[in-house]
Amino acid sequence: MAFYRTPHDVTALPAWKALQQHREAMRGFSMSEAFAADAKRFDQFSLSACGLFLDYSKNLITEQSRDLLVNLANEVGLQDAIKSMFSGEIINASEGRPVLHTALRRPVGDKLSVNGVNVMPEVHKVLNQITELVGRIHDGLWRGYSEKPITDVVNIGIGGSFLGPELVSEALLPYAQRGVRCHYLANIDGSEFHELSANLRAETTLFIVSSKSFNTLETLKNAMAARTWYLAQGGSEAELYRHFIAVSSNKAAAVAFGIREENIFPMWDWVGGRYSLWSAIGLPIALAIGTANFKELLSGAYTMDQHFQTAPFDKNMPVLLALLGVWYGNFWDANSHAILPYDHYLRNITKHLQQLDMESNGKSVLQDGTPVKTDTGPVIWGGVGCNGQHAYHQLLHQGTQLIPADFIVPVVSFNPVADHHQWLYANCLSQSQALMLGKTREEAEAELRAKGLNEADIEKLAPHKVIPGNRPSNTLVVERISPRRLGALVAMYEHKVFVQSVIWGINAFDQWGVELGKELGKSVYQRLVGSLEDSAEDGSTQGLINYFRGKHRG
């Protein structure tokens, strides 16, 4: 039976039991000793694909470890699961949907049926619509109510309608097209809208309202605020269609808002929000970098799709990263994973990967609704390069928790300043090296003696300078961030998340946990404004409601 119909108990598989035994045998394993004993370790545990280079040699693994992890992937039926996803089977079982964000990056001429209908012509029709709209705006042909060209585009959306597009448009800022600035409005906090709108002119601003339902609270409230602002700045209802377009599956609601039907770009149920930057949700990306570069982004993701489907698991970048995550999460008690980009333009990749990973694999039941028997998705956290070294890297080096890390770094900078990039690259490599090597008590004492400290002071200070080392990390290197390489990088992490969900037997494509807070939020709001007088379900929430109301009564 398909993995999404009858999920396995992964802990009962022979490969899982073999990994448990192997973990016991690895208790004394030292990465430093492994490198000293094997001059080819780097070559054995590194690979190139799709413009990316992955060094995973600084991990708590041997060739046997990799073989056993690959056996696990085989025993859970990963190859069949990959085929199921790419062919459009209903792998999102709880919502009864296929999962086909990969269709959005397939080339013209490909065929893919959903419910007996080839969806590829519609996919490329929308891509052509994006191309046409972007061309009109970049050429100054799309005019605002005062007949001036559009200079600013504001994407109103939250979650997947914001995090992915923001990541890509900022990561590819060196490819930005002149004449149009792109902005993002996500939070319902009025301060965000205030700060953004203060620097805009309504007559030259275009808003993109991105919401599948056209009913997402934060997005709809911000869209209404933008509409009120537009009217207050001199715009009219009659000309509103020049300043608002939508990406939504709810055409009726978008039209009722004042958006013309021809300016509503569709969304499909088979594309989840956190996987949607490749769709019309990526319209602000195309506006920022141009459609030629947007298509390069899609092409890069497609090359990773091909690699994922065809490469043997022991040479498959997403599969290897996923297996390493399972290895640490389920056999080494790691609860989190750090994403550490050493590139200013990639500073938002951690936020996107937080949603991608934690919303996908933050699950506690199998596809059939029975409880899992393993830990599942980790906490994803981190931040940009050298800044983190002066903040939280201390915990990575000397804390009590094992926290695997991904270092991401380009070889070439877009903006070389003196020898800054050489230092940036050196810092990235030295951090992964320090995590692995650590510092022994003997090394700490020798270091202090060399500084002239007496033995009593050395005895006191040396324990504080000991760094355990033997802490794992991956290093992902790109020659330089480009649309194609970025597409491959993001797609790689998408597939990594999917592989882990297959191993754990969970559904990576629903997010029911998000809904409860939304439902409760409505009644909390009603109590805040006084339209609902009965007490909240618990004393804490009611107490906080009373505090708010007390302050607002003056």
UniProtKB/Swiss-Prot annotation:
Annotated GO CC locations: cytosol
What does the record give as EC number?
5.3.1.9
Q: Where does this one sit in the cell?
A: Cytoplasm
Q: Where is the active site?
A: 359 (proton donor), 390, 518
| Keyword Transmembrane found | no
Q: Which domain of life is it from?
A: Bacteria
PROSITE patterns in the record: P_GLUCOSE_ISOMERASE_1, P_GLUCOSE_ISOMERASE_2, P_GLUCOSE_ISOMERASE_3
Pathway of action: Carbohydrate biosynthesis; gluconeogenesis; Carbohydrate degradation; glycolysis; D-glyceraldehyde 3-phosphate and glycerone phosphate from D-glucose: step 2/4
Major localization listed first in the record, in broad terms: cytoplasm
Reply yes or no: does the keyword Ion transport apply: no
Q: What Gene Ontology molecular function terms does this protein carry?
A: carbohydrate derivative binding; glucose-6-phosphate isomerase activity; monosaccharide binding
Stated role: Catalyzes the reversible isomerization of glucose-6-phosphate to fructose-6-phosphate.
**What family, per the record?**
Belongs to the GPI family.
State what protein this is by name: Glucose-6-phosphate isomerase 1
Organism of provenance: Pseudomonas putida (strain ATCC 47054 / DSM 6125 / CFBP 8728 / NCIMB 11950 / KT2440)
